[in-house]
Amino acid sequence: MNTVVDTPELMVFTDSAAMKVKELIEEEGNPELKLRVFVSGGGCSGFQYGFTFDEEVNEDDTAFEKNGVTLLVDPMSYQYLVGAEIDYSEGLEGSQFVIRNPNATSTCGCGSSFSA
């Protein structure tokens, strides 16, 4: 059973991130795409974040919806992302999706690796 969560304190999917995902999905021409955010082992701090587009919603995924866009998180990743903010930023260092995670005890300078 899929869980659709509308509770901002569990995870924040910012307007900026949702709008960028919507733009990317429109460029792909496939309205069935959803953004999957995941945590995997690796990176210089033990865990790393990943992003991919997915048409499939797994039975145990948690789905967050914002501005017509769906963000998917698998159960293993969800435990590391509770309370996190998924954002999109554009700056001098380039454009990127950013995760601000209160569960991370340390992060790497690369911004995509953390320890918990």
Swiss-Prot record:
Q: Which Pfam families does UniProt cross-reference here?
A: Fe-S_biosyn
Q: How does it assemble?
A: Homodimer.
**Known InterPro entries for this protein?**
FeS_biogenesis, FeS_cluster_insertion, FeS_cluster_insertion_CS, FeS_cluster_insertion_RrpA, HesB-like_dom_sf
Biological function: Required for insertion of 4Fe-4S clusters.
Is NAD one of the keywords UniProt gives this record?
no
For iron-sulfur cluster, which residues are the binding ones?
44, 108, 110
Q: Which PANTHER family match?
A: IRON-SULFUR CLUSTER ASSEMBLY 2 HOMOLOG, MITOCHONDRIAL
Q: What protein name is recorded for this chain?
A: Putative iron-sulfur cluster insertion protein ErpA
Please state which protein family the record places this protein in.
Answer: Belongs to the HesB/IscA family.
Tell me the name of the encoding gene. Answer: erpA
- What GO terms describe the biological role, i.e. biological process, of this protein? iron-sulfur cluster assembly
PROSITE patterns in UniProt:
HESB
Which NCBIfam families does this one have? Answer: iron-sulfur cluster assembly accessory protein, PRK13623.1
Instruction: Tell me the organism.
Output: Aromatoleum aromaticum (strain DSM 19018 / LMG 30748 / EbN1) (Azoarcus sp. (strain EbN1))
Could you state a single Gene Ontology molecular function term?
2 iron, 2 sulfur cluster binding
